[in-house]
């Protein structure tokens, strides 16, 4: 039986239904309720690292009367390729998967990105449920409806807006998460603090070491606050036509770093460097005060997130950023802060200012 559950409402926009994000412990008992009793088949997409979890979930669903199949995919970003998506499509076809059936994505952010993309493209869209097992997956990837895969040209360049029918954030899954993976997810939580909810930063600053562990006293509150920030934003702007862009704070440089590292860097580590860069860019552009810019470094460093990347890689990173999804024509666009919790767009910054900002990041 599940314990106390926090339910966070994500409002639907034109053409999409609202859904709930459930946060608590021992939540898998809630899954059948989200799937529904009119569904015949369920496909559980899971990474190799969660083979036992995926099979146990498949068996449990089968016991409840569903025709359940487990689809194992590579770990992390290696799953986000068109070849892996095609493998999933083949498995769905062989299972006789119809438009009334449901996909369940179990794993980190990369797995839920893939599962959502497969759901968006199979039969032009089937329902799916996210069961994120990492901090990053809970506070970012599984909430909001952005799904996608990577290409040789960049991260998440092929995808669809396809919100889940529900999200189960079982905090018990974090207990066995490697510390580096847990800390990586804190970058997205810290991002939420800077763009919208400074109370998040205060909770972390009060005890940075406690924030580094799922056993910390504020773990549930940090995750719930971060999800609420994203839920509020995406409820008003599903397809990133305006407000939702603020969620990309730190991500323009981060995605370029990830591509440059062939997706071997943790997403949160790249976002941390990206936020440091965005803070310096905001400062040098005359938008952000020194105290808030400096606060980026102290908060990120206090939980063990990186601040720097190789200086000599700037030309390659700049070229990658030019094909970023947020760019408009040849115009580079960055999310910066006008102050704490005051995100805005900086369009076409002076190349010299960009280089100077990266000079604070490069090593």
Curated annotation (Swiss-Prot):
**Molecular function per GO:** 3-dehydroquinate synthase activity; metal ion binding; nucleotide binding
Residues that bind NAD(+): 109-113, 133-134, 146, 155
Tell me where in or outside the cell this protein is found. Cytoplasm
Q: Which domain of life is it from?
A: Bacteria
Q: Bound how, and how many: what does the cofactor note say?
A: Binds 1 divalent metal cation per subunit. Can use either Co(2+) or Zn(2+).
GO cellular component term of the entry, any: cytoplasm
The first-level EC class reads: lyase
Name one process (GO BP) from the record.
Answer: aromatic amino acid family biosynthetic process
- What are the required cofactors? NAD(+); Co(2+); Zn(2+)
- Known Pfam families for this protein? DHQ_synthase, DHQS_C
User: Where, in this chain's numbering, is Zn(2+) bound?
Assistant: 188, 251, 267
Q: Which reaction does it catalyse?
A: 7-phospho-2-dehydro-3-deoxy-D-arabino-heptonate = 3-dehydroquinate + phosphate
Q: What does this protein do?
A: Catalyzes the conversion of 3-deoxy-D-arabino-heptulosonate 7-phosphate (DAHP) to dehydroquinate (DHQ).
Q: Which family does it belong to?
A: Belongs to the sugar phosphate cyclases superfamily. Dehydroquinate synthase family.
Show the PANTHER family listed in the entry: 3-DEHYDROQUINATE SYNTHASE, 3-DEHYDROQUINATE SYNTHASE, CHLOROPLASTIC
Protein name as it appears in the record: 3-dehydroquinate synthase
Give the organism, scientific name.
Streptomyces avermitilis (strain ATCC 31267 / DSM 46492 / JCM 5070 / NBRC 14893 / NCIMB 12804 / NRRL 8165 / MA-4680)
Where is the organism placed in the taxonomic lineage, from the top? Bacteria, Bacillati, Actinomycetota, Actinomycetes, Kitasatosporales
